[in-house]
Curated annotation (Swiss-Prot):
This protein's pathway: Amino-acid biosynthesis; L-isoleucine biosynthesis; L-isoleucine from 2-oxobutanoate: step 2/4; Amino-acid biosynthesis; L-valine biosynthesis; L-valine from pyruvate: step 2/4
Binding-site residues for NADP(+), renumbered to this chain: 44-47, 67, 77, 107-109, 157
Binding site for Mg(2+) 1: 216, 220
InterPro entries documented for this protein: 6-PGluconate_DH-like_C_sf, 6PGD_dom2, KARI, KARI_C, KARI_N, NAD(P)-bd_dom_sf
The name this protein goes by in its record: Ketol-acid reductoisomerase (NADP(+))
Cofactor annotation remark: Binds 2 magnesium ions per subunit.
Catalytic activity: (2R)-2,3-dihydroxy-3-methylbutanoate + NADP(+) = (2S)-2-acetolactate + NADPH + H(+); (2R,3R)-2,3-dihydroxy-3-methylpentanoate + NADP(+) = (S)-2-ethyl-2-hydroxy-3-oxobutanoate + NADPH + H(+)
Record HAMAP family: IlvC (MF_00435)
Amino acid sequence: MNYFNSLNFRQKLINLRKCKLVEKNFFSKKCDILKRKNIVIVGCGSQGLNQGLNMRDSGLHVSYALRGSSILNKNKSWENATKNNFFVDTYENIIPTADLVINLTPDKQRKEVVTLLQKFMKENSVLGFSHGFHIVEIGQKIRNDITVIMVAPKCPGTEVREEYKKGFGVPSLIAVHMENDPKKIGFEIAKAWAYSLGSHRAGVLHSSFIAEVKSDLMGEQTILCGMLQTSSLVCYDQLVSQGKDPNYAGKLIQLGWESITESVKHGGITLMLNRLSNTAKIRAYILSKKLKVMFSSLFRKHMDDIISGEFSKNMIDDWNSDDKKLKEWRTQIKKTDFEKCKICHKEISEQEYFDQGLLMVAILKAGIELSFEIMVETGIKEESAYYESLHELPLIANTIARKRLYEMNLVISDTAEYGSYLFSQSAIPLLKEFMNELCPGDLGEKISDLQFDNVTLNKINHDIENHPVEIIGKKLRKYMVDMKPIKLS
């Protein structure tokens, strides 16, 4: 039963709106509460491995629980754990010893896994998740004596590790399931877990399982994954149709997202637009307004289906059909020209990505603002909407820079991957049609400087800087004083 849909209207609003920045002084006890505790992570995929590495480096005792068949067959999860010198054992042997069990298995496996875990978990232990989908959308009941918490890093597992190694971290949402906090210790344990990942350096929001799920699904389906995937494919095809060398076009798109979104990470949409000439800024502003109008209905449909539970229902139906749609969409993406083009060795400077990617800048501006606006309209607090529409964006772009869409879809969850493909099915035809409106200088070449009046430029600058996502962004980025620049690919 969908837990969110079982709540009354007031309870839904209270949970959607729950979001408060945890001030740095609240982390004075670091992760001491978890020292000398047995922490067992279930599953050793991208999130499982990289969270475990961070926690161990923070002084915690971490081991892994895998299925007996996984250990016997020495599968990828077993290999991930053992190569990094973690202790691995079966559920029945290791779960009864755990004080904190962190379930990082894929969403589609969690009902079966959580049922099994509850058979072995000792009394008054803690069960952790890094995504609230199972609790909110599946609604499985958890044993009354078990405390249920969440620490949800706002990025793929690979970036959880990379940011930690830089001495920084990634923002996380933490929450305690209101049906399962018998000892009233959930918040302190979640806070310590977040600290061990390095999230205290980047920003920790005290949220709810519901707010995390609904905002996370919206962000990943639209601007974070769906829009980047859609735009990569359509912009690549457009560049090739304009006569650009296919391999150069591939590099411009693949590495362009990373270079452009790095500016967003440090200074929001304002800094991204400031990297353009004044003529290009005005043109990007105009294009982004048109893109917002064009994509508005599609973005709202995704939000509506997420809130109603329709998205989850359809995805679960696909799980029960052996991922028929998911597998078809994966195959389609793998066969695209963008994914198959060769590596280009021609040097492209950082500024050239901006100069030749004016349309890409406009797409990012439109997608960030639209997803943020619709989340806030729905009742999600601005802080949550910011992380899900803007801050996580460069972290996703980093994955595309490594191995294009293959890498992005590999490291994000199956739930994010399904939602991204679903969005692209409708978004690609829209963006292809929009390409007919492009002018020289919008994509693949630098726009010629034109005369403009100061009044127009001043108004555009004011509009960009005073959008609500920019206002909350300035506040939250003050928390991220130790944020490190990425080494561009």
